[in-house]
Amino acid sequence: QLLPIVGEKAMLAQTIDRLTGLVPVEDVFIITNTEQRDAVLEVCPELDPNKVIGEPIGRDTAAAAGLAAVLVRRVDPQAVFAMLPADAVIHDAAGLCKTLDSAFAAAEADPVLATIGINASLPATGYGYIQQGNTIGDYADKAVYQVKRFVEKPDLATAQSYLDAGDYFWNAGM
């Protein structure tokens, strides 16, 4: 996340750049492990040091999301926030921002936990899948759906059946 693996900037810096125009940099919180906190500030000096949080105990994504929710709520109890992994390779930043804008609008209308699905292009066994449920509505010109179910990393035959069904998406982890 702190190296320029894809492109000229560190992946974390690219993640922050993608949000330009949607989320002001002063509203960005980073949850990282304690050992990497200083390196994060070195790679992204525009960040508020008080909003770069070293996890007291490294756990999993759910624990980091919970910590982020508590910290954001302290600043603004009505805030809507997103969890974005720093290691995602995203070529369509504008498309991501449009999707996030729709998710934010849906969450503001009816407090929900939103997740992003990626159109599956092959039967991948290394990704979790999201099965699309009923339409909730249109928000910011995009349809938003309920999640019917989550499936963790299926075998190849099951992944192929999901691709054939047409209502399963790769779980973006966002």
Task: Map each language-model feature to its residues.
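Residue-identity detector for glutamine
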Residues: 1, 14, 36, 78, ...
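Conserved N-terminal catalytic core of the sugar/cofactor nucleotidyltransferase
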Residues: 4-85, 91-92, 101
